[in-house]
């Protein structure tokens, strides 16, 4: 056993680099040898002195081996840390060198914080929105200028007067149209059934005739309204509310002229024939 322990000892003078696996194996072997020696010492009672000396020698050897292993492990850890720090430093240095050696175009700034093109675009869009909003507000103010919401309670009489004026104007317009149509119909009857004379008559009819009729009715209505009493005016307004124009009447399409439209056209043909024979 002593020979086995002596063989397991490590020479302190020769420091060799060992792998962590070998170190673990050496520690296990040393512990196993120590445990065997202790068991033998307990069993054997005769050779205590020799066993104790061997135990002391083995303990010293194991302690020396452990100390050497700890020193070597510390050295290896320091070397690994130095290599890792050197690797990170070299990577950082490479990255910085790449950035510093990079050539930037003259149109773009070298410092990225000074590159404020996006901020300028955002500011420009903001200004455009503000200008559009100002234009819209200005347009609304112009549209709402001099607009006043009518008060139903205060402006009741004024609204009634305006309604009366509007109804009078509409009734007067329809009466003027009716009178103008009557005048045209009378002239057509005077002409007779000749199509040429009718066409000539219709060509002479213009807007001025209608406007003159409308103005004449306006003056006549003013004169008549000035000479009438208030009660007569009210009755006139009520009568004017009814449909005075032919088109607004219920029996407009049922008149005699519309029923006999084909007879009139037949009667016109011989008249044209007579006119032609007279010319010959």
Curated annotation (Swiss-Prot):
Q: How is it modified after translation?
A: Citrullinated by PADI4.
Where Phosphothreonine occurs along the chain?
104
Q: Where is the composition biased (Basic and acidic residues)?
A: 36-45, 233-252
- Disulfide connectivity for this sequence is none
Question: One GO term of the cellular component aspect?
Answer: preribosome, large subunit precursor
Where composition is biased (Acidic residues), the residues are 51-80
Q: What is this protein called?
A: RRP15-like protein
What is the primary gene name for this protein? Rrp15
